[in-house]
Amino acid sequence: MKVIYSAVAVSAIVLSSAASAQDTRRADLLRQRAEIDAQLAALDEAPASAPAKPVEGSPGDVIVTGRALSLTTQVSGQTVTTIGDDAFRNTPATTIADIVRLSPGVTVIQGNGPRDVGVSIRGSNARNGFGARNIQVFEDDFPVTQPDGLARFDLTDPHAYGAVDVVRGPSSARYGNYALGGAVNFRTRRGRDIDGIELGVDGGSYGYVNLFGTIGHAGPRYEYAAFGSFVRGDGATGHTGYQTGTINAYGTYALGDHDRVAVKVIYNEGEFRLAVRSSYNQYLANPYQQGCAVAATAAAGCGTISVFVNGTNGTRIAQTADEGDLARNDRRTIVGTRYEHDFGSDTTWRTQATFDSRVVNQPTSATPFKGTLDSYNITSDVTNHGRIAGMDATSFVGLFYNYLDNQSFSFNKTPAGRNGFGALTQTVFGDIRNLGVRAREELQITPKLQLIAGIGAEYSQIKMRQTAYTYPVGANPVLALVPANRDFWNVAPETAVFWQTTEAVRLHARIGTGYGIPQNGQLFVTSAGVAGNNSDLNAQTNVGVDVGAEIAIGDTLKAEVTGYYEWYRNELVSQSAGVNLLAYTSNVPRSIHRGVEVGLAWRPLPGTKLEASYSYNDHYYTDFSERLTAGATSAVFSRDGNAIPGVIPTFVNARAVYDQPSGPLRGLGGFVEVTYRDRYFIDNGNLLAMPAYTLTNLNLHYDPPGRRFSLYASVQNLFDVTYVGSASVIANSLDPATGLQNPASVLSNVTGSIYAGQPRTVYAGVKAKF
């Protein structure tokens, strides 16, 4: 009985203390609300031109904020969409495709490996089968696109991110080289939001497991967050198992009232087994490459490569991906630091330096590739917040320099599996340098009208040398040297107007320009798909016009619509010459990219939300003739008016969400998501098209207030649709007997193009916070 009485007494004390704590907390909240209301009233009474009062705080406040003009967040003068982590927090988020496809104007395809993703903004990367080209990619405003123009997403785990910013349209005035399509910035979660330790595990079909954790905290002068994960899976397609580990950390520290530093670290290492890209007919016969262990007894539709028996020349034999053990083993290390200093309350100087090392070992085909690509990126700029002619103005000027040291090797493959490297076929040594200046002015003409103008100028230098080796049977090896010493000068202006017509409607119009020099790998592959001289490629450029509107009615309705029209010159188009050959690149003199982008977020009832993004892309050649050759027969074909291959004309993503807003089941919810992709061509002649498809995803989750514990279950591709997940652009060919192009029935046998998309997959995950 004594124990019972003691328990009752303790319970009474706890309950009374809890009640007292609640009363105290309520009083504090009411006091804070009164202070906020008073400050808002003071702002309403102040003149529109009054400068903003500097942020002040008590010793417990966290005020480690940058004052320089951000490259990618809260962007003015661009067409931009931000995706918060509430859209993907309770989903599998196995790749960044699960995030960026929620933005209008963005399409995604599977890349070279289970974690690799090809990302296109307005079709920017549609002719490339992996990674991202023709856009700039950042993490926390640190560059992760190397100076050769390539960004890859194997190193990213979406669980690390709190938001993603997608900037659409030509943007070289702001981002420099390769920003023809725009930019993407991944923002890691902040220490103040984590405030402790979070641990989680996801599991799913085909052996998928993701173990991840985050630690974060913030204090009066510092803030940090560190994320780590280990992911593995067997893959639905044969020979696509993988395992990869990621570390991603970001921290800031205020040295004083006027000085701040930030540090960024990313490390990723992964081992990814790869299937052979199929022809369309192979895909139809065996989409997931099952029964393909041995070429001699392989099932119908199995893809193979052809390797020299001796690794040098002579007789070749066929090998499946299993026999050749095709794979990628890549390591990426990025370390960056940023320093900001305030010259008074209006002017900030910022300097940033980033080291980026990419070490690759890629026996992915009959010509394995190894290389080390180390790069350095330095920027320094000044931002001033002041007034010009009585108008609020933000002025920006900056310098930038980046450098890539390329050391790469290609080999013939032998039959000896993953480490079967035979005779050397080429080496590429050299460097790429980019040096430039950019300036920007943002003027608040009236409280509702803003004018933005910017310009960037850049000098780029490519100094590379290829040494190519061939091994004729019964003769001495032949060595050929191909130098590529190229200089490029590019200037990119832009201007934009934003007009807040009413409290709910904002209109914008923008003219932007972009440019991108050839990548070093494109300079050394001929149209025959072999190593050789292709160093006369030109830089591609574009000029684009955006016109659009944004509607925001409280938290109930947010919508955006943008129409764009872009003129391209010397567009770089890559094509596959076959599974045993290298992809080659050519310039297209003139082409047009135009389309419409729509985004919607509507909350018709408490707890309900309808999200949708729609992209329409009409991209076509206006001046392009292509020569095809077969033996002694050669013919030229006009591609004028043809759709640019690889570009998906219509892409729709819609999600209907319900989350219980109150009561004991608050945080319980789910959504149904539908994705539609239109039919698209994969050749310049527009003869072979990949079929359209629709996917349906189902999600249930429980994420209560406080987020101490959450869980989800998800079914991706609910109806188990078989679809083309990725299709590299293929080359057209000529019938020597007729002098005509070979039809779709022949192109359907061209290998080296297609990966099937993921079949029905079930996931579940749980997270806990301490």
Over which residues does each language-model region extend?
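Extracytoplasmic beta-strand/coil segments of soluble accessory domains associated
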Residues: 65, 72, 97-142
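Face-selective signature of the C-terminal outer-membrane beta-barrel domain
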Residues: 260-266, 326-472, 482, 498-500, ...
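Membrane-embedded beta-barrel scaffold of Gram-negative outer-membrane proteins
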Residues: 348-354, 360, 500, 506-512, ...
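Gram-negative outer-membrane beta-barrel transporters
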Residues: 459-460, 564-568, 586-683, 767-769
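C-terminal beta-signal and adjacent terminal beta-strands/loops
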Residues: 513, 675-681, 702-770
